[in-house]
């Protein structure tokens, strides 16, 4: 039934995480839920980190909205499909319960099967992008005592009715998450394709260029380490994450957060900070953007 964490001293904010069934783990990163019980008129604020795609349903009455880059969603869709993101989003909510299924790039290719770059840094009505499936999956989740069981059943059935994804997607995912990988030319060589073909593959299935995704992974590693410490002096943590120049980290803070790290640390983000801990406990990694590639891959080079 997963694990739950309380995110506020008064117990009004909570999150839940569960693993998908093993045969779905290459496609689904996690199942999670966010609940807030706030007095009428009170609005909470939080952070949506840069991530892969996800499908999110608001159950019952409630309110949530978000700002993602220059786009403002107020209110957000009740049945929402979040495309892969390169910007942190800043959410607001009243009382609500949202349940989610995170999609890896392989899951996007297998189940959604659309050009991810067209949905990058966007939140859309899931029914418009995933017609038929969004409504059916919502109905299954609403009826279930255990959302994870409903998600597992639906995606297992969908797995039997969809074509296998290209093997190159898993190979690229592994390279994008390798902290030692810094050169696109080396990545292209190990993928046995030219850089232009690599760029097209990355945009279609991951939403962005390989260069941006390598920067996103490096930045997420640094940001998570900073949020885990109560002290200043972040230079060593930034270096450990792969930055060799502090100015590059400062630049990436503006790119991925639209603000300095010091300002981001001070923002209210109770659910996000709790999710870093709970996700690591349940799944082994604190953020979806760093969710590991399927095991057993072989990459030449």
Task: Identify the role of each PLM range.
Residues 200, 220-224:
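Contiguous, well-ordered alpha-helical segments that form the cores/surfaces of helical PPI scaffolds
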Residues 211-216, 222:
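Amphipathic alpha-helical "recognition" segments
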Residues 221, 248-251, 255:
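Hydrophobic side chains within alpha-helical segments
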């Amino acid at each position: 039934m997963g694990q739950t964490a309380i995110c506020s001293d008064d117990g009004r904010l909570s999150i839940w995480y569960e693993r998908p069934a093993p045969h779905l783990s290459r496609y689904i990163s996690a199942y999670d839920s966010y609940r807030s019980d706030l007095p009428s008129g009170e609005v909470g604020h939080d952070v949506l980190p840069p991530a892969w795609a996800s499908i999110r349903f608001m159950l019952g009455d409630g309110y949530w909205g978000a700002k993602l880059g220059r786009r403002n969603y107020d209110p957000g869709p009740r049945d929402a499909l979040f495309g892969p993101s390169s910007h942190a989003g800043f959410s607001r909510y009243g009382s609500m319960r949202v349940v989610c299924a995170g999609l890896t790039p392989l899951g996007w290719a297998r189940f959604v099967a659309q050009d991810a770059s067209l949905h990058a840094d966007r939140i859309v009505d899931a029914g418009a992008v995933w017609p038929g499936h969004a409504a059916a999956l919502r109905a299954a989740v609403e009826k279930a005592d255990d959302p994870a069981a409903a998600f597992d059943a639906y995606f297992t059935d969908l797995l039997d009715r969809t074509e296998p994804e290209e093997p190159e997607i898993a190979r690229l995912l592994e390279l994008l998450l390798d902290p030692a990988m810094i050169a696109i030319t080396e990545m292209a060589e190990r993928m046995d394709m030219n850089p232009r073909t690599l760029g097209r593959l990355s945009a279609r299935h991951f939403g962005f260029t390989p260069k941006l995704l390598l920067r996103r992974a490096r930045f997420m590693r640094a940001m998570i380490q900073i949020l885990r410490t109560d002290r200043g002096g972040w230079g060593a943590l930034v270096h450990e994450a792969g930055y060799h120049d502090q100015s590059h980290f400062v630049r990436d803070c503006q790119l991925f957060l639209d603000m300095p790290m010091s300002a981001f640390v001070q923002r209210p983000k109770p659910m996000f900070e709790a999710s870093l801990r709970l996700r690591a406990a349940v799944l082994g990694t604190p953020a979806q953007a760093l969710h590991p590639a399927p095991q057993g891959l072989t990459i030449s080079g």
